[in-house]
Amino acid sequence: MKLQIILLISAFILLLSISHTEAFLGFLKNLFGKRALRDLNKYDYMSDPSFSAEDIKALRELFR
């Protein structure tokens, strides 16, 4: 009975460590990936047709 409990606890700890390691590696991958290094969402407002040229100019000044 003790062996079964020890095996269950060790399997649980192993699964937890694998899932946390995978999440940590995914975080590092996203942190240092090409898309993470460039902020691609910075100029999403430029594709909005409701903005005038003056609005875009004002937004560019704000983002400087």
Swiss-Prot record:
GO biological process per UniProt: regulation of defense response to virus
Expression by tissue: Expressed by the venom gland.
Signal sequence bounds: 1-23
Gene Ontology cellular component list: extracellular region
Superkingdom assignment: Eukaryota
Residues annotated with Phenylalanine amide modification: 32
Residue stretch(es) of the prosequence: 36-64
Entry keyword set: Amidation, Antimicrobial, Antiviral protein, Secreted, Signal
Localization per record: Secreted
Other facts noted in the record for this chain: inhibits hepatitis C virus (HCV) infection by inactivating infectious viral particles. However, it cannot suppress established infection because of the poor cellular uptake and restriction of endosomes.
Protein family according to the UniProt entry: Belongs to the non-disulfide-bridged peptide (NDBP) superfamily. Short antimicrobial peptide (group 4) family.
Role of this protein: Antimicrobial peptide.
Name of the protein in its database record: Peptide Ctry2459
